[in-house]
């Protein structure tokens, strides 16, 4: 708990003076005002995060948290639970979606076993930080204890801190865990006061009947556990997931270290809701990636108050959307660093 508290204490507001200078520079680059749209806003945000009008994000990593979910036994997923461990090992082989997309920007993919149901070979290349062998069935009781949730948050903090110590300047969040759209929808239902029926989607290939069953399970989990919407730790402990808490920890660590962090899709946005509930200033360090095809995604991004960068009907997870947006973040840096102002170019208008 001390690590979590200290991390939260370190999170500061963005540097407004640097942002003002960055805005003035962007407004005077050799182009019509606002002609590069949200790329200009992103450059200003990066300046405020890094305290320089010449931000760089050369060293990039996506931390992929992997864990299983006890609620799987309620029939809420369209794929076998074994996919979690198979895909977790595939991250090491470099053959998953996020690995392929990450190659575009030279991004390091870091898979972390924070709660996979099976034991993984410690020499396989996955970072072993297992809290427990998957969550408990939240339809019958808490997904995990409060202490386990705090520990999962702190695992995310520790992994992110290590990568930042090693020189990473841009982080992304990813996940792997069959059943985690159920946990994410439960979190969103609690924090946004939504009826699960309104925001429950197909996840990994559910039928219409399966979606109805999933919504009913989520409603039952909330009724059984009565999570406190004003306490993010209580919410993620009772109806969340280990990988969701881990991603929230990554976001908190990024903010504490003044490192931009790209939020992937629906599950990562649920993690962002937890992180921001623990420290609202964390939101200023988040860079949204894509509008997920998952039905609750729009509600989640609206509740968080972020606007996705791209709309491509993605719903893979893994950090795949973050990987696609990394080049956009780099482009924002190149724009403010490589384009001259009218004065620098000797142009009078």
Curated annotation (Swiss-Prot):
Put simply, this protein is called Nicotinate-nucleotide--dimethylbenzimidazole phosphoribosyltransferase
Under Enzyme Commission nomenclature, its number is 2.4.2.21
The residues that cross the membrane are none
Q: What does this protein do?
A: Catalyzes the synthesis of alpha-ribazole-5'-phosphate from nicotinate mononucleotide (NAMN) and 5,6-dimethylbenzimidazole (DMB).
What pathway is this protein a component of? Answer: Nucleoside biosynthesis; alpha-ribazole biosynthesis; alpha-ribazole from 5,6-dimethylbenzimidazole: step 1/2
- Top EC class, one word: transferase
PANTHER family from the UniProt entry? NICOTINATE-NUCLEOTIDE--DIMETHYLBENZIMIDAZOLE PHOSPHORIBOSYLTRANSFERASE
- What does the sequence similarity comment in the record state about its family? Belongs to the CobT family.
A Gene Ontology biological process annotation? Answer: cobalamin biosynthetic process
The protein's annotated catalytic reaction(s) are: 5,6-dimethylbenzimidazole + nicotinate beta-D-ribonucleotide = alpha-ribazole 5'-phosphate + nicotinate + H(+)
Q: Which residues form the active site?
A: 318
Report disulfide bridges, numbered on this chain: none
Query: What keywords are annotated for this sequence in UniProt?
Result: Cobalamin biosynthesis, Glycosyltransferase, Transferase
Q: Which GO terms describe its molecular function?
A: nicotinate-nucleotide-dimethylbenzimidazole phosphoribosyltransferase activity
